[in-house]
Amino acid sequence: MWMHNGGIGSWNSGVKRRLVSSVGDRWFSMVQGSTDSEWAFALFLDSLAKLGFDPDGEEYQTDGFGHTTLRKAMLKTIERINGFIKGVPEDVRDKDTRSLLNFAITDGKSVVCTRYVSSQTDEAASLFFSSGTSWKRRGTVKGSAEGKGDYRMERRDRGADIVLVASEPLTFERDNWVTVPTNSTLTIHNQTVLIHPIIDEFYNSSPSFKRSSKFAETKGQITTEMAKATVNDLSRDASTSSLSSAVGAIDLAAG
């Protein structure tokens, strides 16, 4: 399963042609559409194959590829996308070449997600996770449909039996949710959640450095501060329509 939230910079100004030309015939013929998300998946499969792992190999159908391999292929995918953008002549490509690459991939055993922006100064679209041992409904919100209510993550030990990943917190318990840092990977494997920095030209190791949220917001993306503000607002007014919308999303996630 593959997911993408964001967009590849200069997609229709030379990057798409370079990406499409770079993937093997096997992955080229697989793509049925023209979106950057579909072609990014083809590029991921091509990167996985070039690492020596056949995406259709029977030996991987039961145990998967391993989270380390998935992460390597994901990082290679991002590296290649950045390379395609650099390869487009400046007089052809868009003035703004920044990409928002929040990807997610799973082989049925491990999950690897990214929160990434190809910029040294901008914040990526937000990404959060919540982990614990049980996902419980605390009560029914007044006026909501039967079965809908306020949920929270509970933890009885260090294991992560349940891990939820979302672009914004799905509950009003802010302390249930951990922000994935900009330009990082989130890996879920065997009840363990790992976060690794994506160290490239756009990485900033300073914990005090504050990135700008303007770029992601102009692309219609939720940023970390926006998501935090939404949770705080909803927790003060449990009667808002936004609350019902959020609770509905929680039901889908729990189901």
Annotate each predicted stretch with a short phrase:
Residues 1-255:
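Conserved short alpha-helical segments that host acidic/polar catalytic motifs at enzyme active sites
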